[in-house]
C-alpha cells in the first residue's frame, strides 16, 4: 500500500474468523455468543486511533443489525418466493399494487444509505474485504441463504435440528429471475471516493442506480432520512402480514387443507294450494288413494247382522256366487254334514272348539260356498288380504247351524263367540289351502301336457281323457268325398255285367253280386283304417 494512503488495519485471524462466523451463523439462524475479547477495539485498529476503533465496533453492531434484518426478511419471504409471481393479480384486487417489490424491499432493508459523519476529522472505516461479496450483491446473498438454509434445501444439507422438515421447493419463475440478477455486476464505491465533509468527488460519478449500492458505515446517528426507512419497515411488515393472511385464506401453504363442511339449509316447500304442487313435479304412476280401514274382526261384522231364525231361513243356500263360480257344484244336505260330525269316532274326545272348527269347514266347502269360491275369497278384512271376503250371508248361516248343534256345550254367549272367531280363522286358512291346491293341480296338469307334447311332437293340452291317455285325433270327412251306398253299387254292377259276354257256363247273378259286395266292403274298410290313427294302449 502507498505511504499517503491510510494504513490498512492489521486484522487478526480470529477477528476474520469472527466476521465469517457472524455472517454465516446469521444466515443459518443461529448467533454465537460474542465475548469481550472478541469485541476488543484494539484488535480492529492499530492501537493509535481509538476513535477509529470505536467506529469499527459500532460498525460491527450495525452489521449484526443488518444481518438480523436480512435474516427476518429472508425467513418470511423465501418460503413464499416460488408462489410470489403467481399471486400478483390477487393482491392487485386487494389494493396492494402500490407496495414495493420484493427485490426493492430487500435492497432497501439491506443496503440503505446511512448518515455520514459530520465531523471532518473522523474518516469512515473501510468495509472488511471478507464480507464485501456478500453485501455487494443482494441476489448473491439470497442465493447463499437458499443454499445454506436447511428448510429450503433439505435434499442437499442435513437440517440443524431433527424436528425441522426436509422440505424442497421446486424451481419457479421467481428463483430464475433472482438467479439472472446474480450475473449482473454491481459496482462497489469505496470510502475513498467520499471526502471528509460527506460529499462525493468528481472521480466517483455514478448513476442513480449505483448510489443505492453505497454502504457507508456511519456512527449510528439518526438523520431525517430514517423516517423513510421506518415507513418502509412498516410497509414491509404490513405486506408480510397481508401475505400470510392471503396465503392462509387461499390454502397455498397447506398441501392438504381441511375443507369446511357446509350443511345445506333444509328445503322448505309450501303446502299445495288449490291442487297445485308449487312447481314440484309429481312422481310417475297412478295416484294412490288411501284405503279406508276395514274391520277385520268377522265376529263384529256377523253380530251386527240380523241373526234371527226367520231371516236366516230366507237365505239362499248355497250362495249364488258359489253356483256362478262353479256351475257343477252340487251341495250336500245340512243333516248329512251334521251326522258326519256327530257320528265321528273322535266326536266325544274332541273339545267343543275343535268340533265347531270341523263343522264350519265342512259346511263351507260342501254346502255353502264350494271349493271354487273358497279359492277366490277369504275370511278377513281388506287390510289383511288382497282377496275379497266370503259372502256374509253364508257365514251367518254357518253361525246359525253351529249355534243349533253346539250351543249347549258352551258356558256363556261370549265363550261361543270366542270359539266362533277361532273357527273363522281356521276357515280362512282352509281357503288358502284350497287356493294352493288348485294352483298345484293346475301346474301339474300343465307339466303333464308339456311332457306329452314334447314326446309326440304336437301340442295337445286338452286331448287327455280321465285316465291320462291320449285320445285319438278324429279327422272330419270332407263333404266332397264320394261315399258309395248300396243303390249306387248295385247300379254300377248291373251296368258292368251288361257288357260282359255270356258264356256257356253262366254263373248266377246273385253269386257274382255277393262276391263283388264283399270285395268292395274290404276295400272301404281298408281306406277308413288308413285315415284314422291306431288305438294306443294304456301308458
From Swiss-Prot:
Tissue: High levels in hypodermal, intestinal, body wall muscle, nerve ring, and ventral nerve cord cells of embryos and L1 animals.
Entry keyword Transmembrane helix: no
Main localization (coarse): nucleus
Region (Involved in sequence-specific DNA-binding): 296-440
Post-translational modification, as annotated: Cleaved by caspase ced-3 in vitro.
Region named Disordered: 162-230, 262-293
Molecular function terms, GO-annotated: double-stranded DNA binding; RNA polymerase II transcription regulatory region sequence-specific DNA binding; single-stranded DNA binding
Subcellular localization(s) per the UniProt record: Nucleus
Effect of residue 432 to A: In syb5772; abolishes binding to nlp-45 promoter DNA sequence in vitro and causes sterility, dumpy appearance, protruding vulva, precocious alae, and derepression of nlp-45 gene expression at an improper time during the larval L1 stage
Biased composition (Low complexity): 274-284
Outcome of substituting residue 430 to A: In syb5772; abolishes binding to nlp-45 promoter DNA sequence in vitro and causes sterility, dumpy appearance, protruding vulva, precocious alae, and derepression of nlp-45 gene expression at an improper time during the larval L1 stage
Phenotypic consequence of gene deletion: Asynchrony between gonadal and vulval development. Retarded uterine uv1 cell differentiation. RNAi-mediated knockdown results in the precocious onset of tail tip retraction resulting in over-retracted and shortened adult male tails (also known as the Ore phenotype). RNAi-mediated knockdown in a ced-3 and ain-1 double mutant background reduces the percentage of animals with developmental defects including impaired egg-laying and production of ectopic seam cells. RNAi-mediated knockdown reduced the number of dauer animals in a dcap-1 mutant background.
Cysteines paired by S-S bonds: none
Keyword Lipoprotein recorded: no
Protein role: Heterochronic protein which controls the choice of stage specific cell fates. Involved in the temporal progression of vulval fate patterning, possibly by inhibiting lin-12. Acts as a transcription factor involved in the stage-specific repression of various genes, including insulin/insulin-like growth factor gene ins-33 and neuropeptide-encoding gene nlp-45. Binds to the consensus sequence 5'-[CT]GGA[AG]-3' in the regulatory elements of target genes. Plays a role in governing the developmental timing of male tail tip morphogenesis.
Protein name stated in the entry: Protein lin-14
Record organism: Caenorhabditis elegans
Amino acid at each position: 500500500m502507498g505511504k499517503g494512503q491510510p494504513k490498512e488495519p492489521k486484522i487478526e485471524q480470529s477477528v476474520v474468523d469472527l466476521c465469517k462466523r457472524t455472517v454465516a451463523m446469521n444466515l443459518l439462524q443461529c448467533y454465537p455468543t460474542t465475548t469481550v475479547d472478541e469485541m476488543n477495539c484494539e484488535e480492529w485498529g492499530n492501537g493509535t486511533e481509538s476513535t477509529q476503533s470505536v467506529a469499527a465496533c459500532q460498525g460491527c453492531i450495525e452489521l449484526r443489525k443488518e444481518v438480523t434484518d436480512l435474516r427476518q426478511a429472508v425467513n418470511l419471504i423465501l418460503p413464499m418466493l416460488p408462489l410470489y409471481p403467481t399471486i400478483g393479480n390477487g393482491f392487485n384486487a386487494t389494493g396492494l399494487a402500490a407496495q414495493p417489490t420484493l427485490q426493492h424491499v430487500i435492497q432497501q432493508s439491506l443496503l440503505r444509505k446511512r448518515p455520514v459523519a459530520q465531523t471532518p476529522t473522523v474518516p469512515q472505516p473501510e468495509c472488511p474485504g471478507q464480507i464485501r461479496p456478500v453485501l455487494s450483491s443482494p441476489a448473491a446473498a439470497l442465493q447463499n441463504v437458499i443454499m445454506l438454509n436447511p428448510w429450503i434445501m433439505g435434499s442437499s444439507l442435513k437440517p440443524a435440528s431433527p424436528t425441522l422438515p426436509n422440505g424442497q421447493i421446486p424451481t419457479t419463475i421467481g428463483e430464475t429471475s433472482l438467479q439472472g440478477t446474480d450475473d449482473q455486476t454491481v459496482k462497489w464505491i469505496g470510502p475513498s471516493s467520499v471526502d471528509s465533509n460527506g460529499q462525493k468527488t468528481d472521480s466517483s460519478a455514478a448513476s442513480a442506480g449505483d448510489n443505492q449500492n453505497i454502504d457507508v458505515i456511519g456512527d449510528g446517528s439518526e438523520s431525517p432520512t430514517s423516517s423513510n426507512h421506518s415507513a418502509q419497515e412498516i410497509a414491509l411488515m404490513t405486506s408480510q402480514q397481508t401475505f400470510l393472511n392471503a396465503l392462509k385464506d387461499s390454502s397455498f401453504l397447506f398441501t392438504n387443507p381441511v375443507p369446511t363442511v357446509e350443511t345445506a339449509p333444509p328445503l322448505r316447500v309450501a303446502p299445495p294450494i288449490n291442487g297445485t304442487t308449487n312447481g314440484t313435479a309429481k312422481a310417475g304412476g297412478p295416484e294412490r288413494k288411501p284405503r279406508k280401514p276395514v274391520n277385520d274382526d268377522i265376529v263384529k261384522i256377523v253380530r251386527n247382522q240380523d241373526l234371527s231364525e226367520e231371516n236366516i231361513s230366507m237365505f239362499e243356500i248355497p250362495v249364488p256366487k258359489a253356483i256362478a263360480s262353479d256351475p257343477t257344484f252340487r251341495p250336500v244336505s245340512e243333516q248329512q254334514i251334521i251326522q258326519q260330525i256327530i257320528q265321528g269316532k273322535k266326536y266325544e274326545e274332541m273339545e267343543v272348539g275343535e268340533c265347531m272348527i270341523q263343522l264350519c269347514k265342512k259346511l263351507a266347502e260342501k254346502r255353502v260356498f264350494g271349493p271354487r269360491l273358497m279359492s277366490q275369497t277369504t275370511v278377513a278384512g281388506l287390510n289383511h288380504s288382497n282377496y275379497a271376503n266370503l259372502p256374509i250371508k253364508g257365514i251367518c248361516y254357518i253361525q246359525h247351524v253351529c249355534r243349533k248343534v253346539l250351543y249347549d256345550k258352551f258356558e256363556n254367549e261370549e265363550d261361543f263367540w270366542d270359539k266362533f272367531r277361532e273357527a273363522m280363522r281356521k276357515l280362512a286358512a282352509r281357503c288358502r289351502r284350497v287356493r294352493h291346491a288348485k294352483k298345484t293341480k293346475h301346474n301339474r296338469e300343465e307339466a303333464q301336457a308339456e311332457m306329452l307334447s314334447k314326446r309326440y311332437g304336437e301340442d295337445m293340452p286338452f286331448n287327455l281323457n280321465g285316465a291320462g291317455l291320449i285320445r285319438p285325433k278324429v279327422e272330419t270327412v270332407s263333404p266332397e268325398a264320394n261315399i258309395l251306398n248300396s243303390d249306387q253299387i248295385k247300379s254300377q254292377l248291373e251296368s258292368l255285367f251288361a257288357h260282359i259276354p255270356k258264356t256257356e257256363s253262366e254263373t248266377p247273378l246273385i253269386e257274382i253280386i255277393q262276391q263283388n259286395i264283399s270285395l268292395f266292403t274290404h276295400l272301404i274298410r281298408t281306406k277308413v283304417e288308413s285315415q284314422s290313427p291306431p288305438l294306443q294302449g294304456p301308458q
